[in-house]
Structures are given as C-alpha cells and as structure tokens.
Amino acid sequence: MRATTGARHLHPPWRRGLRHHRQSTMPPRASRGRLADAALFTAGAVLGSVLLLTLASPFSSSSSPSSGVGSGEVDRLGGGRTFYDDPGVAYTIDRPIVGWDEKRAEWLRAHPELAGGGGERVLMVSGSQPEPCGSPAGDSLLTRLLKNKLDYCRLNGVQLLYNTALLRPSMDRYWAKIPVVRAAMVAHPEAEWVWWVDSDAVLTDMDFRLPLSRYRDHNFVAHGWPHLVYESRSWTSLNAGVFLIRNCQWSLDFMDAWAAMGPDSPEYQHWGAVLTSTFKDKVFNESDDQSALVYMLLQSGSPWRDKVYLESDYYFEGYWLEIAGRLGNITERYEAMERGAAPLRRRHAEAEHASYAAARDAALAGAGLAESGVSGWRRPFVTHFTGCQPCSGHRNEHYTGKSCDEGIRRALSFADDQVLRAYGFRHAGPLSDAVSPLPFDHPTQTA
C-alpha cells in the first residue's frame, strides 16, 4: 500500500509510545536422644537465623510464596522483593513497562554493591544469526569480530552481551536489535547505558573510552549530522548500527515508538511507503530502523529530539571506505610519536592498559594528532563495514568482495596489534594472519 493524499490517518508512533512516568514445612519429630537433641538445636539455630534475616530485610515479604520455594530462601537469594517478582514486568517488546525509573532505582538501592560505585556502567550488546554463515569465510570473520569486541571490553571495563537468538522472529534483520536491547535493559538494571554495536563493526581504537559526561543531558547517542537530518532530510543522515541508549523510562518509551514502525505493526507496509516518500534518497520501499529513527526526529512536536545526541566530533561509528585505506598511515604517525616518548615504549602488564592509554592520549594532544575524523590522525574509534555483509556475503552491489574482505582484515589486524603489543607480538603485515615478536623498545628510532 502506497501513501497517497487520501491515505488513512495514522497515529504517530511517538504518541503511542509516550507514557506518563509513574509512578516450610517442619520435619517429623525426632525420637529423644543426644542425636535428636543436637538435630533440634541445629534446626532451631537455622530457624532463628532465617527469622533474623527476614526481620532485618527492608522489603515486605507479605506476598504469596512461590511454589516449592520458601520465602526465606527467596530473601537470601534476591535480597527481598524487586520488580523481578512482578509478573507484569516483561522482557518482550510487546509488553510496555511503566515506572521503570522507580523500579530500577529501588533495585539499585537493594544492591549497592552493583550500583557502579559512582561510575556509569556500560553494557555492550551485539549479536549475529544462530545458523551458520552463508559466506565461506563468514563464520571465521564473525569469530574475529567477536574477539575484537571482547578485547575492547576487557581492556576498558565494559561488560559484553553477545546474542545469537532471535528474540522476536517477526522482527528480523535490522529490527532484531530492538528486542535484544529492550531485554538487556531489564536484565541489567546495574547498567546506566546499553551500547549496541553491529556485528560488522570493528573497535579500532583500544585506548578510546566513551565520553559519557558529554551525554549527561541526553538519553540516545548516534553518529549523525543535524543539518543532514533537519535540512537535507536524508535517511543516511545518521547510522543506526551503533548507538548508545540510557537505561531509563524515556528509552523504553522511545523503543516502543521506534518498534511501532517495524514489522510487528499492522501498518508496516504503509510506513514503508511513508518513509520512501519522505526521504528522496531512499531507494527501497520498506520501513527500516534507520529511516524510522530519522523520521521520528523530523516530526514537529517530537518528544524525542531534545534527548537525542547526534555525535560527529569523532568516529563514534565511521564509514569503512573512508577509513580502511588510511590505517597504515595512522600506524606510522603513532609510531613516530612514540619514538620521541620513551615512557610510552616501556613494556607493561595488560592490566595497566588504562594508564598507558591516558598517557598516549596526552602525547597525541602534544603532538597535534588528537583530532579525529577524515582530516585527523587519531585512530578511528569504530570502523563500521556497513553494506559488506561478511556473514551472508550479500554485500552492497557498489562494493567488491575484495574491498570488503581486505578492509575488514586490515581493520581487525590494526586493532589486534594494539592488543598483541602487551604480549610482545604484532601481525607480520596488515593482511597477514601470522605474527612476529616485537623487538625490545619498539618502536625505536632507526638510523
């Protein structure tokens, strides 16, 4: 069904998505005797301990106990009742949650040891299909892409959730991430931010950490350009393959509105026509997550725009074609900088990575190399191989298999060399899987 002048009126999904933020049995009696007395004493001591734990709990235990589990056991396992004990709170995208900020705050008060200690915890979420890849090299590339994310998270104190299950079969392909992110927010109330990273994105700067303080007044961050969104009205004005979303009620409502333009909606076909007519550069008549996101921001009176941060100051997500060919030169610039900074060349434990990353950042600034982007020499934070489809092999017709394959391998080796350095190795070349030992005091100035 195509959009026409006489098309039926649709209630905008951001209106539907916006909501008000509201608020044992006793054992048989034993026969008398020393053993029986000892058993009775032990049972009494255990019962007394359970009563003390129950009385000391700040949460009410008046609700009916679950089948087969005593209330004392529940209190010991979970520290008292939380939103997890409410059957009305669901993990699925079709079951809206209300009062999430209060529910999450209550859980954090009950689990202060998991509250982050004043920092903002980040959960990276990524994933791939459950079945084997169609491309011959696809599974190998996915393994290396997963390793890349594991490396970054280990070095920078980020948790990683990698999912291979299709949580909502009706929302597949680019829509599949929304149900996963929604479930992750409920499963990880300790995380202030959920960071979605497409499987075909490579973390190419192991030193860089998300500048969370600059997003303190925002709830959603994507790589994009305001003038392309609001003036050019382009569906490629931002990229939805990598985004940062705050774990809050606003975000749950935002994802409900976003998903309402997806394949679960009875108006899905109509939304495809609306988006195609709205974005003149959109070449396929289908409602996709990225076009839907731009459309939500464009609408007058949108409740989302003020809380969305379009990041363009660094490669929050960078287009691989403008990055892959520059990686070798970037390596040379870094090595030239380190030849003049002996402390940076010092061998160190991997656990000291954060300290050396901070020192390297300071040295970059001093050498005038801190600028990111096309004109800068800082390592790109994320290199996104959008359109390459390394698993299926069904790449964009504008890209050759060689350019995609070599680009991904270059980016992975570039990132892996930063990790291997702590182990005394590096790749023999940008397209080589072989590694060689690093000489002492690498990279020293040569004659």
Curated annotation (Swiss-Prot):
The EC number(s) given in the record are: 2.4.-.-
Query: The organism's lineage?
Result: Eukaryota, Viridiplantae, Streptophyta, Embryophyta, Tracheophyta
Where is there biased composition of kind Basic residues?
A: 8-23
| Name listed for the protein in its UniProt record | Probable glycosyltransferase 7
Instruction: Kindly give the membrane topology term recorded for this protein.
Output: Single-pass type II membrane protein
Q: Which residues lie on this side of the membrane: Lumenal?
A: 61-447
Q: Where is this region: Disordered?
A: 1-31
Origin species, per record, is Oryza sativa subsp. indica
Subcellular location per UniProt equals: Golgi apparatus membrane
